[in-house]
Amino acid sequence: MTRIANFVVWIVLAGLAIVFYMGITGQFRSGTVAVPSPKVIDPVGPRPPVIVGGVTVGPAGLAVPVAGVKAEQLIDTFTQSRAGGTRIHDAIDIMAPEGTPVLAAAPGKVEKLFNSEGGGGVTVYVRSPDERWSYYYAHLQGYAPGLSEGQQVRRGQLLGRVGYTGNANPQGPHLHFAINRMQPGEKWWQGSPVNPYPLLAGKGASR
Protein backbone atom coordinates (compact mmCIF):
# COMPACT_ATOMS: atom_id res chain seq x y z
CA MET A 1 0.00 0.00 0.00
CA THR A 2 2.84 2.32 0.87
CA ARG A 3 4.48 1.67 -2.49
CA ILE A 4 1.25 2.55 -4.30
CA ALA A 5 0.88 5.78 -2.30
CA ASN A 6 4.46 6.77 -3.02
CA PHE A 7 3.97 6.01 -6.70
CA VAL A 8 0.84 8.18 -6.82
CA VAL A 9 2.66 11.06 -5.10
CA TRP A 10 5.55 10.72 -7.55
CA ILE A 11 3.12 10.80 -10.54
CA VAL A 12 1.40 13.93 -9.17
CA LEU A 13 4.70 15.74 -8.59
CA ALA A 14 5.99 14.79 -12.02
CA GLY A 15 2.79 16.06 -13.59
CA LEU A 16 3.05 19.36 -11.77
CA ALA A 17 6.65 19.73 -12.89
CA ILE A 18 5.67 19.09 -16.52
CA VAL A 19 2.83 21.62 -16.33
CA PHE A 20 5.12 24.22 -14.75
CA TYR A 21 7.81 23.64 -17.38
CA MET A 22 5.34 23.88 -20.24
CA GLY A 23 3.92 27.07 -18.81
CA ILE A 24 7.29 28.74 -18.42
CA THR A 25 8.59 27.74 -21.84
CA GLY A 26 5.33 28.81 -23.41
CA GLN A 27 5.61 32.21 -21.78
CA PHE A 28 9.16 32.65 -23.05
CA ARG A 29 8.06 31.68 -26.56
CA SER A 30 5.19 34.14 -26.44
CA GLY A 31 7.38 36.86 -24.95
CA THR A 32 5.10 37.39 -21.93
CA VAL A 33 7.69 36.88 -19.20
CA ALA A 34 8.71 40.21 -17.67
CA VAL A 35 12.48 40.53 -17.48
CA PRO A 36 13.41 42.48 -14.31
CA SER A 37 15.21 45.77 -14.83
CA PRO A 38 18.77 46.07 -13.53
CA LYS A 39 18.78 47.29 -9.95
CA VAL A 40 19.91 50.90 -9.56
CA ILE A 41 22.22 51.47 -6.63
CA ASP A 42 22.11 55.01 -5.20
CA PRO A 43 20.60 56.58 -8.33
CA VAL A 44 21.08 60.09 -6.97
CA GLY A 45 24.71 59.59 -6.00
CA PRO A 46 27.70 60.86 -7.97
CA ARG A 47 28.88 58.87 -10.95
CA PRO A 48 32.26 57.23 -10.31
CA PRO A 49 35.30 58.16 -12.37
CA VAL A 50 35.97 56.09 -15.49
CA ILE A 51 38.98 55.47 -17.68
CA VAL A 52 38.83 56.91 -21.21
CA GLY A 53 41.85 56.43 -23.41
CA GLY A 54 44.04 55.75 -20.39
CA VAL A 55 42.95 59.00 -18.69
CA THR A 56 40.86 59.05 -15.50
CA VAL A 57 37.70 61.05 -16.17
CA GLY A 58 35.50 62.31 -13.33
CA PRO A 59 31.70 62.58 -13.23
CA ALA A 60 31.75 66.08 -14.74
CA GLY A 61 33.69 64.86 -17.77
CA LEU A 62 36.97 66.34 -16.54
CA ALA A 63 40.19 64.36 -16.76
CA VAL A 64 42.35 64.12 -13.66
CA PRO A 65 45.08 66.48 -14.91
CA VAL A 66 48.10 64.52 -13.69
CA ALA A 67 49.03 61.31 -15.50
CA GLY A 68 48.84 58.17 -13.39
CA VAL A 69 46.90 59.77 -10.54
CA LYS A 70 43.64 58.02 -9.69
CA ALA A 71 40.55 59.86 -8.53
CA GLU A 72 40.63 58.18 -5.13
CA GLN A 73 44.12 59.58 -4.53
CA LEU A 74 42.95 63.18 -4.75
CA ILE A 75 42.74 65.29 -1.60
CA ASP A 76 40.37 68.20 -1.15
CA THR A 77 42.62 71.17 -0.33
CA PHE A 78 40.15 73.79 -1.58
CA THR A 79 39.76 76.74 0.87
CA GLN A 80 42.62 75.57 3.08
CA SER A 81 44.58 78.43 4.61
CA ARG A 82 47.97 79.33 3.21
CA ALA A 83 50.83 81.66 4.20
CA GLY A 84 49.98 81.50 7.86
CA GLY A 85 46.30 82.10 7.28
CA THR A 86 46.76 85.24 5.19
CA ARG A 87 45.19 83.74 2.07
CA ILE A 88 42.80 80.99 1.00
CA HIS A 89 43.74 78.16 -1.34
CA ASP A 90 41.23 78.41 -4.20
CA ALA A 91 42.40 75.19 -5.88
CA ILE A 92 43.45 71.63 -5.16
CA ASP A 93 47.03 70.41 -5.05
CA ILE A 94 47.75 67.13 -6.82
CA MET A 95 51.00 65.68 -5.56
CA ALA A 96 53.21 63.80 -8.03
CA PRO A 97 56.91 63.30 -8.77
CA GLU A 98 58.65 66.09 -10.62
CA GLY A 99 58.36 65.63 -14.38
CA THR A 100 55.04 63.76 -14.29
CA PRO A 101 52.92 64.75 -17.32
CA VAL A 102 50.27 67.40 -16.72
CA LEU A 103 47.20 66.87 -18.92
CA ALA A 104 44.37 69.13 -20.01
CA ALA A 105 41.37 68.45 -17.78
CA ALA A 106 39.02 69.62 -20.51
CA PRO A 107 39.16 70.86 -24.09
CA GLY A 108 39.58 74.54 -24.81
CA LYS A 109 41.91 77.28 -25.99
CA VAL A 110 45.21 78.15 -24.35
CA GLU A 111 44.37 81.67 -23.26
CA LYS A 112 47.59 82.56 -21.43
CA LEU A 113 51.05 81.16 -20.76
CA PHE A 114 52.40 83.08 -17.81
CA ASN A 115 55.40 82.90 -15.49
CA SER A 116 54.63 84.25 -12.04
CA GLU A 117 57.91 83.91 -10.16
CA GLY A 118 56.46 84.70 -6.74
CA GLY A 119 53.15 82.93 -7.25
CA GLY A 120 52.10 80.11 -9.52
CA GLY A 121 55.40 79.91 -11.37
CA VAL A 122 55.08 78.46 -14.85
CA THR A 123 51.34 78.46 -15.52
CA VAL A 124 48.76 77.66 -18.19
CA TYR A 125 45.27 79.14 -18.49
CA VAL A 126 42.84 77.25 -20.74
CA ARG A 127 39.42 78.75 -21.56
CA SER A 128 36.52 76.42 -22.33
CA PRO A 129 34.94 76.55 -25.81
CA ASP A 130 31.87 78.36 -24.44
CA GLU A 131 34.19 80.75 -22.53
CA ARG A 132 32.31 80.10 -19.29
CA TRP A 133 35.16 78.27 -17.56
CA SER A 134 38.88 78.77 -17.08
CA TYR A 135 41.22 75.94 -16.10
CA TYR A 136 44.43 76.97 -14.34
CA TYR A 137 47.56 74.81 -14.09
CA ALA A 138 50.41 76.11 -11.93
CA HIS A 139 53.91 75.30 -10.59
CA LEU A 140 54.81 73.51 -13.82
CA GLN A 141 58.36 72.41 -14.49
CA GLY A 142 57.87 73.61 -18.06
CA TYR A 143 55.54 73.59 -21.03
CA ALA A 144 54.89 70.81 -23.53
CA PRO A 145 56.91 71.29 -26.74
CA GLY A 146 55.11 73.63 -29.13
CA LEU A 147 52.42 74.74 -26.68
CA SER A 148 51.35 78.29 -27.53
CA GLU A 149 48.69 80.86 -26.74
CA GLY A 150 45.62 80.53 -28.92
CA GLN A 151 46.21 76.81 -29.44
CA GLN A 152 43.23 74.47 -29.18
CA VAL A 153 43.80 71.54 -26.83
CA ARG A 154 41.78 68.40 -26.28
CA ARG A 155 41.02 66.65 -23.02
CA GLY A 156 44.01 64.59 -21.90
CA GLN A 157 46.52 66.48 -24.07
CA LEU A 158 49.97 67.14 -22.63
CA LEU A 159 50.34 70.71 -21.35
CA GLY A 160 53.53 70.44 -19.34
CA ARG A 161 55.08 68.59 -16.43
CA VAL A 162 54.75 68.69 -12.66
CA GLY A 163 57.26 70.94 -10.95
CA TYR A 164 57.69 73.37 -8.07
CA THR A 165 58.18 76.73 -9.79
CA GLY A 166 56.88 79.90 -8.16
CA ASN A 167 56.16 79.74 -4.45
CA ALA A 168 55.87 75.94 -4.29
CA ASN A 169 58.02 73.91 -1.91
CA PRO A 170 60.83 72.08 -3.78
CA GLN A 171 60.30 69.17 -1.40
CA GLY A 172 56.73 68.73 -2.60
CA PRO A 173 56.34 69.03 -6.36
CA HIS A 174 52.69 69.17 -7.34
CA LEU A 175 50.13 70.57 -9.73
CA HIS A 176 48.07 73.47 -8.42
CA PHE A 177 44.79 73.04 -10.33
CA ALA A 178 42.00 75.60 -10.23
CA ILE A 179 38.68 76.11 -12.00
CA ASN A 180 37.10 79.53 -12.33
CA ARG A 181 33.58 80.35 -13.47
CA MET A 182 33.89 83.21 -15.94
CA GLN A 183 31.44 86.00 -16.66
CA PRO A 184 31.24 87.65 -20.10
CA GLY A 185 34.17 89.99 -20.60
CA GLU A 186 36.28 88.65 -17.74
CA LYS A 187 40.00 88.21 -18.43
CA TRP A 188 42.23 85.22 -17.79
CA TRP A 189 43.24 86.39 -14.30
CA GLN A 190 39.63 86.92 -13.18
CA GLY A 191 36.68 84.62 -12.44
CA SER A 192 35.00 82.99 -9.43
CA PRO A 193 36.71 79.91 -7.94
CA VAL A 194 34.91 76.56 -8.05
CA ASN A 195 36.07 73.53 -6.09
CA PRO A 196 37.56 71.02 -8.59
CA TYR A 197 37.58 68.13 -6.10
CA PRO A 198 34.00 66.81 -6.41
CA LEU A 199 34.12 67.28 -10.19
CA LEU A 200 37.21 65.09 -10.46
CA ALA A 201 36.75 62.63 -7.62
CA GLY A 202 33.01 61.99 -7.83
CA LYS A 203 32.67 62.76 -4.11
CA GLY A 204 31.22 65.56 -2.07
CA ALA A 205 33.52 68.35 -1.02
CA SER A 206 35.03 67.86 2.43
CA ARG A 207 34.44 71.47 3.37
Language-model features and meaning:
Residues 1-4:
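N-terminal Lys/Arg-rich, disordered targeting/topogenic segments
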Residues 144-171:
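Beta-rich strand-turn-strand
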Residues 23-122, 155, 164, 193-207:
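Surface-exposed, glycine-biased beta-strand/turn segments
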Residues 123, 162-175, 182-186:
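Active-site loop architecture of trypsin-fold serine endopeptidases
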Residues 62, 133, 145-154, 176-207:
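Acidic, glycine-rich catalytic/binding loops that coordinate metals and/or anionic ligands
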Residues 95, 127-129, 180-182:
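A generic structural motif
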Residues 105-149, 172-174:
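Zn2+-dependent peptidoglycan hydrolase active-site motif and core
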Residues 6-24:
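Hydrophobic membrane-insertion alpha-helices, especially the h-region
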